[in-house]
């Protein structure tokens, strides 16, 4: 039987507009996911809707407005471009974007693959280089929840992660080298990954190991002292312990140790988004400067750069063999 192949690329998602209604809807779906917030539903869901969302939505709207572009959210723009460039790489495949939260959803993407395109082989590529139960596993949860509604389903190839993929490592290394050439050699390079609660690591999530794998492989290709590289973790919220060191704490501390020139890259983000453009490029830059830092450069995510599209294409080809 001739293979009719479909590919779904999946990222976390984004509000459709930088207003309270859209942001609240998005955050409600995101923060209701037990993979993300693994505490008692009996306590969390009422607290989420009665207290947390009204306050968080208001604050988040202002943050989104800082990074919003005329064509929409940076994450959506980047993701749609990634899809379009992958279509050029695989003109005979059906390729859709399926966000974990918000639209276009995984549900709609799978429906197209089965009902419209009639694919018999489906590749799911979560756009998270390092596996975590909070991201990659949540995508798999959603895929399974949707796929069980259909009588006839395609063969499914689920790509767990690509933390050690040579093309990905080369792409990240290339971004760092380009920034060094453009902005000069920094005194310190910060590799900031999204943080997760320590409890998730203790319970078996190998996310921290996968981040370390990426860091080690990038440094093996980078002519830069390992003593001048710090791996840290961002986007902490809540009162429970998260993996450390925390990016904002590292960045505030460095100037006090005489480090006044740093560059920051976020290798775990395949597309620039709120966490990179606002939290790192704006918030953490201000933290660094307020504490006496002089030069701060954020190294952009791979987005839909030529090297990234080729990297993603190679990952897909590898799983087609």
Swiss-Prot record:
Pathway: Porphyrin-containing compound metabolism; protoheme biosynthesis; protoheme from protoporphyrin-IX: step 1/1. The keyword NADP does not apply. It catalyses: heme b + 2 H(+) = protoporphyrin IX + Fe(2+). It comes from the Bacteria. Fe cation binds at residues 194, 275. Pfam families: Ferrochelatase (PF00762). The keyword Metal-binding applies. InterPro entries: Ferrochelatase (IPR001015), Ferrochelatase_AS (IPR019772), Ferrochelatase_C (IPR033644), Ferrochelatase_N (IPR033659). It is an enzyme of class 4 (lyase). PANTHER family: FERROCHELATASE (PTHR11108), FERROCHELATASE, MITOCHONDRIAL (PTHR11108:SF1). Catalyzes the ferrous insertion into protoporphyrin IX. NCBIfam families: hemH (TIGR00109). HAMAP family: Ferrochelatase. This is Ferrochelatase.
């Amino acid at each position: 039987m001739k293979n009719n192949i479909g590919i779904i690329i999946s990222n976390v998602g984004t509000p459709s507009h930088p207003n309270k209604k859209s942001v609240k809807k998005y955050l409600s779906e995101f923060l209701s996911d037990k993979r993300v917030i693994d505490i008692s539903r009996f306590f969390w869901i009422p607290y989420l809707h009665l207290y947390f969302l009204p306050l968080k939505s208001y604050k988040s709207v202002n943050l989104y407005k800082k990074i919003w572009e005329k064509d929409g959210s940076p994450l959506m723009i980047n993701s749609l471009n990634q899809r379009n460039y992958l279509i050029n790489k695989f003109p005979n495949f059906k390729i859709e974007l399926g966000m974990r939260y918000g639209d276009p959803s995984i549900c709609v993407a799978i429906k197209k693959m089965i009902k419209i395109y009639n694919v018999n082989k489906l590749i799911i590529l979560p756009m998270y280089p390092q596996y975590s139960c909070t991201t990659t596993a949540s995508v798999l949860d959603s895929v399974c929840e949707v796929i069980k509604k259909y009588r006839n389903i395609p063969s499914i190839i689920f790509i767990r992660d690509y933390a050690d993929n040579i093309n990905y490592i080369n792409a990240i290394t290339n971004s760092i080298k380009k920034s060094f050439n453009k902005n000069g050699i920094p005194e310190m390079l910060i590799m900031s990954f999204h943080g997760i609660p320590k409890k998730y690591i203790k319970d078996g999530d190998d996310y921290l190991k996968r981040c370390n794998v990426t860091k080690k492989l990038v440094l093996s290709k980078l002519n830069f002292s390992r003593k001048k590289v710090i791996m840290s973790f961002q986007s902490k919220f809540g009162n429970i312990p998260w993996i450390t060191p925390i990016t904002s704490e590292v960045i505030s501390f460095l100037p006090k140790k005489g480090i006044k020139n740093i560059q920051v890259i976020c290798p775990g983000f395949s597309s620039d988004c709120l966490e990179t453009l606002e939290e790192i490029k704006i918030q953490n830059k201000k933290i660094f400067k307020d504490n006496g830092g002089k030069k701060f450069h954020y190294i952009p995510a791979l987005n839909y750069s030529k090297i990234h599209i080729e990297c993603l294409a190679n990952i897909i080809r590898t799983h087609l063999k």
